[in-house]
Amino acid sequence: MVKLNGNPGEKGAKPPSVEDGFQTVPLITPLEVNHLQLSAPEKVIVKTRTEYQPEQRNKGKFRVPKIAEFTVTILVSLALAFLACIVFLVVYKAFTYDHSCPEGFVYKHKRCIPASLDAYYSSQDPSSRSRFYTVISHYSVAKQSTARAIGPWLSAAAVIHEPKPPKTQGH
Protein backbone atom coordinates (compact mmCIF):
# COMPACT_ATOMS: atom_id res chain seq x y z
CA MET A 1 0.00 0.00 0.00
CA VAL A 2 1.10 3.52 -0.61
CA LYS A 3 0.91 6.34 1.85
CA LEU A 4 -0.50 9.44 0.19
CA ASN A 5 1.09 12.04 2.49
CA GLY A 6 4.55 11.49 1.11
CA ASN A 7 6.34 14.52 -0.33
CA PRO A 8 8.42 13.87 -3.47
CA GLY A 9 11.13 16.29 -2.28
CA GLU A 10 11.85 14.23 0.85
CA LYS A 11 13.30 11.16 -0.80
CA GLY A 12 15.73 9.96 1.76
CA ALA A 13 14.80 12.06 4.77
CA LYS A 14 12.93 9.42 6.63
CA PRO A 15 13.32 5.69 6.32
CA PRO A 16 10.08 3.80 5.63
CA SER A 17 8.54 2.48 8.77
CA VAL A 18 7.35 -1.06 8.70
CA GLU A 19 5.29 -0.59 11.82
CA ASP A 20 2.35 1.25 10.19
CA GLY A 21 2.35 -0.98 7.05
CA PHE A 22 2.70 1.87 4.55
CA GLN A 23 5.55 2.68 2.23
CA THR A 24 6.23 6.26 1.32
CA VAL A 25 6.60 6.20 -2.46
CA PRO A 26 6.21 9.45 -4.34
CA LEU A 27 3.29 9.35 -6.76
CA ILE A 28 4.84 11.82 -9.20
CA THR A 29 8.35 11.19 -10.43
CA PRO A 30 10.34 13.42 -12.73
CA LEU A 31 10.32 12.38 -16.41
CA GLU A 32 13.51 11.75 -18.29
CA VAL A 33 13.72 12.71 -21.95
CA ASN A 34 15.57 9.53 -22.89
CA HIS A 35 12.57 7.45 -21.92
CA LEU A 36 10.07 9.59 -23.83
CA GLN A 37 11.39 9.33 -27.39
CA LEU A 38 12.09 6.13 -29.18
CA SER A 39 14.91 6.09 -31.62
CA ALA A 40 13.88 6.44 -35.23
CA PRO A 41 13.79 3.11 -37.09
CA GLU A 42 16.53 2.52 -39.59
CA LYS A 43 14.19 0.85 -42.04
CA VAL A 44 10.73 2.18 -42.93
CA ILE A 45 8.24 -0.14 -44.65
CA VAL A 46 5.80 1.59 -46.96
CA LYS A 47 2.82 -0.50 -48.00
CA THR A 48 2.01 -0.19 -51.66
CA ARG A 49 -0.81 -1.44 -53.78
CA THR A 50 1.11 -4.53 -54.84
CA GLU A 51 0.78 -5.99 -51.35
CA TYR A 52 -2.99 -6.08 -51.69
CA GLN A 53 -3.16 -8.63 -54.50
CA PRO A 54 -5.83 -10.85 -52.90
CA GLU A 55 -8.37 -8.06 -53.45
CA GLN A 56 -7.36 -7.74 -57.10
CA ARG A 57 -7.80 -11.48 -57.66
CA ASN A 58 -11.38 -11.34 -56.43
CA LYS A 59 -12.37 -8.47 -58.73
CA GLY A 60 -13.13 -10.81 -61.62
CA LYS A 61 -14.91 -13.38 -59.48
CA PHE A 62 -18.32 -13.14 -57.88
CA ARG A 63 -18.08 -11.72 -54.38
CA VAL A 64 -20.62 -12.63 -51.75
CA PRO A 65 -22.39 -9.40 -50.74
CA LYS A 66 -22.67 -8.50 -47.10
CA ILE A 67 -26.00 -8.89 -45.34
CA ALA A 68 -25.86 -5.29 -44.20
CA GLU A 69 -26.19 -4.14 -47.81
CA PHE A 70 -29.46 -6.03 -48.28
CA THR A 71 -31.16 -5.28 -44.98
CA VAL A 72 -33.95 -3.29 -46.62
CA THR A 73 -34.47 -5.94 -49.30
CA ILE A 74 -34.72 -8.67 -46.69
CA LEU A 75 -37.23 -6.68 -44.63
CA VAL A 76 -39.36 -5.92 -47.70
CA SER A 77 -39.36 -9.56 -48.79
CA LEU A 78 -40.35 -10.69 -45.29
CA ALA A 79 -43.18 -8.15 -45.24
CA LEU A 80 -44.43 -9.37 -48.63
CA ALA A 81 -44.29 -12.99 -47.48
CA PHE A 82 -46.27 -12.08 -44.37
CA LEU A 83 -48.90 -10.27 -46.44
CA ALA A 84 -49.15 -13.23 -48.83
CA CYS A 85 -49.79 -15.53 -45.86
CA ILE A 86 -52.51 -13.21 -44.60
CA VAL A 87 -54.17 -13.13 -48.04
CA PHE A 88 -54.09 -16.92 -48.32
CA LEU A 89 -55.56 -17.23 -44.84
CA VAL A 90 -58.42 -14.86 -45.69
CA VAL A 91 -59.15 -16.71 -48.95
CA TYR A 92 -59.08 -20.06 -47.15
CA LYS A 93 -61.45 -18.81 -44.47
CA ALA A 94 -63.79 -17.40 -47.13
CA PHE A 95 -64.03 -20.76 -48.89
CA THR A 96 -64.40 -22.85 -45.76
CA TYR A 97 -66.78 -20.44 -44.03
CA ASP A 98 -69.69 -22.25 -42.39
CA HIS A 99 -72.57 -21.14 -44.57
CA SER A 100 -76.00 -20.78 -43.06
CA CYS A 101 -78.86 -22.40 -44.93
CA PRO A 102 -82.52 -21.33 -44.89
CA GLU A 103 -84.98 -23.14 -42.67
CA GLY A 104 -85.68 -26.68 -43.81
CA PHE A 105 -82.27 -27.08 -45.47
CA VAL A 106 -79.09 -28.75 -44.22
CA TYR A 107 -75.52 -27.79 -45.17
CA LYS A 108 -73.75 -30.93 -46.42
CA HIS A 109 -70.93 -31.41 -48.88
CA LYS A 110 -70.57 -27.64 -49.43
CA ARG A 111 -74.22 -27.29 -50.49
CA CYS A 112 -77.56 -26.53 -48.90
CA ILE A 113 -79.84 -29.51 -49.46
CA PRO A 114 -83.41 -30.07 -48.28
CA ALA A 115 -83.61 -31.74 -44.90
CA SER A 116 -86.11 -34.30 -46.21
CA LEU A 117 -83.61 -35.49 -48.84
CA ASP A 118 -80.91 -35.77 -46.23
CA ALA A 119 -83.16 -37.78 -43.93
CA TYR A 120 -84.30 -40.04 -46.78
CA TYR A 121 -80.83 -40.87 -48.10
CA SER A 122 -79.14 -41.12 -44.71
CA SER A 123 -81.64 -43.80 -43.63
CA GLN A 124 -80.75 -45.96 -46.65
CA ASP A 125 -77.72 -48.19 -47.08
CA PRO A 126 -74.20 -46.71 -47.59
CA SER A 127 -74.18 -47.61 -51.30
CA SER A 128 -76.90 -45.04 -51.88
CA ARG A 129 -74.42 -42.21 -51.35
CA SER A 130 -73.52 -42.17 -55.03
CA ARG A 131 -77.22 -41.78 -55.85
CA PHE A 132 -77.38 -39.05 -53.22
CA TYR A 133 -74.65 -37.06 -54.99
CA THR A 134 -76.40 -37.64 -58.33
CA VAL A 135 -79.66 -36.28 -56.96
CA ILE A 136 -77.87 -33.25 -55.53
CA SER A 137 -76.17 -32.49 -58.85
CA HIS A 138 -79.48 -32.88 -60.76
CA TYR A 139 -81.09 -30.62 -58.22
CA SER A 140 -78.45 -27.94 -58.81
CA VAL A 141 -78.71 -28.24 -62.61
CA ALA A 142 -82.50 -28.05 -62.52
CA LYS A 143 -82.38 -25.07 -60.18
CA GLN A 144 -80.07 -23.23 -62.55
CA SER A 145 -81.92 -24.08 -65.77
CA THR A 146 -85.47 -23.15 -64.80
CA ALA A 147 -86.96 -20.12 -63.18
CA ARG A 148 -89.45 -21.97 -60.99
CA ALA A 149 -88.70 -24.31 -58.10
CA ILE A 150 -88.27 -27.95 -59.13
CA GLY A 151 -88.18 -30.99 -56.92
CA PRO A 152 -84.95 -33.00 -57.18
CA TRP A 153 -86.92 -36.17 -57.91
CA LEU A 154 -88.08 -34.79 -61.27
CA SER A 155 -85.83 -34.99 -64.28
CA ALA A 156 -84.93 -31.77 -66.05
CA ALA A 157 -86.43 -33.01 -69.35
CA ALA A 158 -89.86 -33.63 -67.81
CA VAL A 159 -90.01 -30.10 -66.44
CA ILE A 160 -88.93 -28.32 -69.61
CA HIS A 161 -91.55 -30.07 -71.81
CA GLU A 162 -94.92 -29.22 -70.37
CA PRO A 163 -97.76 -31.58 -71.18
CA LYS A 164 -99.80 -30.56 -74.23
CA PRO A 165 -103.53 -30.03 -73.87
CA PRO A 166 -105.56 -32.98 -75.15
CA LYS A 167 -106.90 -32.70 -78.71
CA THR A 168 -110.57 -32.30 -79.12
CA GLN A 169 -112.36 -34.45 -81.70
CA GLY A 170 -114.32 -31.56 -83.17
CA HIS A 171 -112.19 -30.58 -86.17
Curated annotation (Swiss-Prot):
Locations listed in the record: Membrane; Golgi apparatus, trans-Golgi network membrane; Cell projection, Dendrite; Endosome membrane
Database matches in Pfam families: Calcyon (PF06387)
Record topology, Lumenal segments: 93-171
Keywords linked to the UniProt accession: Cell projection, Cytoplasmic vesicle, Endosome, Golgi apparatus, Lysosome, Membrane, Signal-anchor, Transmembrane, Transmembrane helix
Residues spanning the membrane: 72-92
Residue numbers spanned by region Disordered: 1-21
Gene this chain is encoded by: Nsg2
UniProt name for this protein: Neuronal vesicle trafficking-associated protein 2
This protein's GO CC annotations: cytoplasmic vesicle membrane; dendrite; early endosome; early endosome membrane; endosome; glutamatergic synapse; Golgi cis cisterna membrane; late endosome
GO molecular function, one term: clathrin light chain binding
Segments on the Cytoplasmic side according to the record's topology features: 1-71
